[in-house]
């Protein structure tokens, strides 16, 4: 992205992505099955550029969050970027669905033939057509991916990464975080591994009410979306 990005830097990156997305959406009313290969390739290149920039900033926010899941600043940034990327994805969704469901087979084959490095990607997209919903429905799912299951996973991370484990090593009780306990799980001494696992599982057992509720709601979310 850039070295030590500030909020101002991130705002500029987001503004650039939003500007390019808005520009791309202007082609919606002019999409036709008989579009020339040259114009089609230009559209693919444009949307690839937007996706690349969105992925970079999304990756940065995820890494910041992974570095310290207890950081309110990192959590806020991740949620902000996730919401922004979801909104941009929804604005570009029309092109994805147009390619999957609205263009006839003859023109699709014609465009795939001249698509070069995008050919296999385009073929794969066509295979997904029968599993795609309407644009309003797909937009709802994209939004729920940020505010629904994804938000629950972040909550789970915050809870479990804050766990403090008490384990007895060589007759001495020690307090450890998850990363420190993991080193004992891989110990070459069976008794130490056993003590580490017991400490790990006991902590999850103590919190089974809240973590179990999170699991159930995530699975229910998948079921509601027709995944499970």
Feature map (PLM): residue ranges:
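A well-structured
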Residues: 1-228
């Amino acid at each position: 992205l850039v070295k030590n990005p500030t909020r101002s830097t991130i705002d500029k990156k987001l503004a650039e992505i939003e500007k390019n997305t808005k520009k791309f959406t202007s082609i919606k009313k002019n999409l036709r099955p008989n579009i020339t290969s040259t114009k089609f390739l230009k559209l693919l290149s444009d949307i690839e550029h937007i996706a690349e920039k969105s992925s970079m900033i999304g990756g940065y926010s995820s890494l910041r969050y992974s570095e310290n899941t207890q950081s309110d600043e990192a959590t806020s940034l991740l949620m902000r970027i996730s919401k922004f990327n979801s909104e941009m994805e929804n604005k570009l969704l029309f092109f994805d669905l147009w390619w999957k469901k609205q263009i006839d087979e003859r023109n699709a084959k014609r465009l795939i033939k001249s698509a070069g490095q995008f050919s296999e990607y385009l073929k794969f997209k066509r295979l997904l057509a029968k599993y795609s919903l309407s644009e309003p429905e797909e937009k709802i799912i994209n939004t729920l991916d940020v505010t629904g299951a994804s938000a629950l996973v972040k909550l789970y991370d915050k809870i479990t990464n804050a766990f403090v484990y008490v384990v007895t090593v060589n007759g001495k009780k020690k307090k450890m975080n998850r990363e420190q306990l993991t080193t004992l799980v891989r110990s070459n001494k069976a008794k130490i591994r056993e003590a580490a696992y017991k400490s790990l599982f006991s902590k999850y057992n103590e919190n089974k009410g809240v973590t179990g509720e999170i699991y159930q709601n995530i699975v229910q979310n998948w079921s509601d979306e027709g995944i499970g």
